[in-house]
């Protein structure tokens, strides 16, 4: 049994600093085709787009954790190209206190590859660097591992320095980290683990979009 035709309500996200000004334009873009027909694995499918809900990127990933939020909390969504920062006070997102910094994981990747090239005169596979960033180690010789680890530690230090620029104080608030950058903080950061929560679930954002959209549609009846 499989569903081949359905009404679909889209739930998606925009960068925090874009959500106010671009929400309606992006909604119109996503709904420009009221229905689509396509073939997948030899079967025909037909979707009708019934609506679209848009949310700030990052925030949906922590929706299921809001029950634990008290007072002031800071959310850092560290993606491939950017880091989105959002304050959440008493479980409510503060849209006036959100920022986007071009400090994504790819910057660390580029810096690590360049460091190896500069120091050893060789090019290193991106997949090898990715393994080190994700797991903290790889099957390479110690000098190369030390070089890349040093760059990763510098990158994480810069992340925390940037957060402090926006008044992050671990003694006064808890930090929640989502996105691919969380593994770098875990592997190469120096922080109070009791005050920082790293959400590893790669589906957390998608689950959050679904939960928020479902609650919104339920309220409308």
Can you say where each PLM-predicted feature lies in the sequence?
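Phosphate-handling catalytic cores of nucleic-acid transaction enzymes
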Residues: 76
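Short, basic interhelical loop/turn and adjoining N-cap
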Residues: 120-124
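Short beta-strand scaffold segments in enzyme catalytic cores
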Residues: 83-87
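Acidic, metal/cofactor-coordinating or nucleic-acid-engaging core segments within structured domains
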Residues: 113-119
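Nucleotide/phosphate-binding catalytic cleft detector across ATP-hydrolyzing
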Residues: 1-73, 92-107, 127-221
């Amino acid at each position: 049994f499989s569903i081949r035709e359905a009404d679909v309500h889209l739930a998606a996200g925009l960068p925090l600093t874009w959500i106010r000004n671009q929400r309606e334009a992006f909604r119109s873009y996503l709904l420009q085709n009221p229905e689509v027909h396509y073939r997948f694995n030899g079967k025909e499918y037909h979707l009708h787009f019934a609506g679209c809900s848009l949310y700030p990127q990052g925030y949906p990933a922590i929706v299921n954790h809001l029950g634990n939020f008290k007072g002031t909390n800071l959310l850092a969504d560290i993606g491939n190209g950017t880091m989105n920062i959002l304050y959440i006070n008493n479980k409510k997102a503060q849209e006036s206190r959100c920022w986007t910094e071009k400090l994504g994981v790819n910057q660390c990747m580029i810096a690590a590859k360049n460091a190896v090239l500069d120091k050893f005169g060789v090019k290193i596979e991106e997949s090898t660097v990715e393994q080190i960033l994700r797991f903290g180690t790889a099957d390479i010789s110690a000098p190369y591992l030390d070089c890349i680890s040093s760059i990763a530690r510098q990158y994480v230090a810069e992340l925390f320095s940037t957060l402090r620029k926006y008044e992050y104080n671990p003694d006064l608030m808890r930090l929640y980290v989502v996105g691919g950058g969380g593994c770098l903080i875990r592997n190469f950061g120096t922080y109070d683990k009791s005050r920082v929560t790293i959400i590893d679930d790669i589906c957390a954002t998608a689950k959050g979009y679904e939960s928020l959209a479902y609650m919104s549609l339920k309220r409308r009846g």
